[in-house]
Amino acid sequence: MSKTIAINAGSSSLKWQLYEMPEEKVVAKGIIERIGLKDSISTVKFDDKKDEQILDIVDHTQAVKILLEDLTKHGIIKDFNEITGVGHRVVAGGEYFKESALVDDKVVEQVEELSALAPLHNPAAAAGIRAFREILPDITSVCVFDTAFHTTMQPHTYLYPIPQKYYTDYKVRKYGAHGTSHQYVAQEAAKQLGRPLEELKLITAHVGNGVSITANYHGQSIDTSMGFTPLAGPMMGTRSGDIDPAIIPYLVANDPELEDAAAVVNMLNKQSGLLGVSGTSSDMRDIEAGLQSKDPNAVLAYNVFIDRIKKFIGQYLAVLNGADAIIFTAGMGENAPLMRQDVIAGLSWFGIELDPEKNVFGYFGDITKPDSKVKVLVIPTDEELMIARDVERLKAK
C-alpha cells in the first residue's frame, strides 16, 4: 500500500499528514514546532493516540529525520519504502508555475527566488523540500503552489494601475494565495449544491490567521483579495491587509523605530491586523471575549475586521453579477459563527437569509434558510488532501 505525505513547512515548524493513496485515508498526522530551539515539540497523532516529545531540533533536515523516525517507531510504516510521494505546500509560484510541479534542482531554485513574494513562507518551504530530497532522494516530490489556482485571472484583474515596466521588468502584479483551499472548497460546494461547478458563481472566504476572498466563476478564479504578496486584502490576524501605500514612507520619515520600508512591511505583516488594533491578541476567540467585556479596542478590532471582509464579498458580488453561494472556510470561517453572522447581516439586500440555529451550532454545510436566494455554506478546508491528490496525479504521468 503506497503512502503519500503532505508537508506544510513554516519558518520554525513542519506540519504533516500521511495518507494511504488512492484511498485518501489519513494514516497519521502531526506537527514539529519551535524548530531551531532547544525545546522543540514533535507531536504525532495516529489510531486515536497522541505522542508528544520535547527535543532539540536544530533545522528542518533534522525535523524530517525525527518525523520519519516517529513513523517507524510507532509502527505507522515498516520502512521508508512505503512512502512513495511527498507534496510540499508552496505559497508563491509567481508566473513560473501555473500548476503543481515535480521537484528538481531548478524548481527549488525558483521557489527560493520567489521568496520576495512570500518572505514568511517560501524560504521555509524550500528548506523542507531540500530536507526531504536529502533523506528520501528517490521518492516522487511535488510542489503544490497556493498561487497556481489564481493564474486564470485576466490582465485587467491582476495588473496594478502603475507604469507597465514594473510588470514587464519586475513582474509586479497580483498573484493571490490560499488557492489550494479556495479550489477545494469550491469543488466541495458544487457537490453539496448538487450542481456542476462549471455552472456556478461562488465567493469563497478563507478566514484564518490569513484571510483571502476569491471570486470563482464556473470553477475558475477570476479575482482574489491577496495581491503581489499575502499582505494584501482584508484585515487579518497579524497582517494589516490593504492600506494606502503612502503610509510607508510617512512612517519611515516620522517613527524612529521604523528605519526603512522593510521595517514597516515587517510591522504590517507581524504586528498589525487584529493584534495591532486590539493591542492584545490576533486570536478571534480573545477578541470575542473582549466584546463580552466591552473592551473598546477589541470592539474596534472586531468591527474593522467585519467591515473589511464584508466589503470584499460585496465587491465580488458585483464582479460576478450575483452569486449562487458564499463559502466560509479555515479556522475562523469554520468556527466563528458570530463573525459569519455579522458579515452576512450586511448583505441581506442580496436576498441572503441566514438560519441562526444552523449558524450558531457549528453546522457544516448550508447555514441559510430554504428560501435564501444566495446560499451560505461552511466547508472545512483540506489543503493536505489536495496536495496528496496532486502528488498521485503527477506520479501517474
UniProtKB/Swiss-Prot annotation:
Q: Where is this site: Transition state stabilizer?
A: 178, 239
Cysteine disulfide partners in this protein: none
GO annotation (BP), single = acetyl-CoA biosynthetic process
What domain of life?
Answer: Bacteria
Q: In which pathway does it act?
A: Metabolic intermediate biosynthesis; acetyl-CoA biosynthesis; acetyl-CoA from acetate: step 1/2
Q: Which GO terms describe its molecular function?
A: acetate kinase activity; ATP binding; magnesium ion binding
One Pfam entry for this protein is Acetate_kinase
Q: How is the cofactor bound?
A: Mg(2+). Can also accept Mn(2+).
Q: InterPro entries per the record?
A: Ac/propionate_kinase (IPR004372), Aliphatic_acid_kin_short-chain (IPR000890), Aliphatic_acid_kinase_CS (IPR023865), ATPase_NBD (IPR043129)
Cofactors (names): Mg(2+); Mn(2+)
Q: Can you say where in the cell this protein is located?
A: Cytoplasm
Q: What is its EC number?
A: 2.7.2.1
Question: What positions does the entry give for ATP binding?
Answer: 15, 206-210, 283-285, 331-335
User: What the protein does?
Assistant: Catalyzes the formation of acetyl phosphate from acetate and ATP. Can also catalyze the reverse reaction.
Q: Which family does it belong to?
A: Belongs to the acetokinase family.
Protein name stated in the entry: Acetate kinase
Taxonomic lineage of this organism?
Bacteria, Bacillati, Bacillota, Bacilli, Lactobacillales
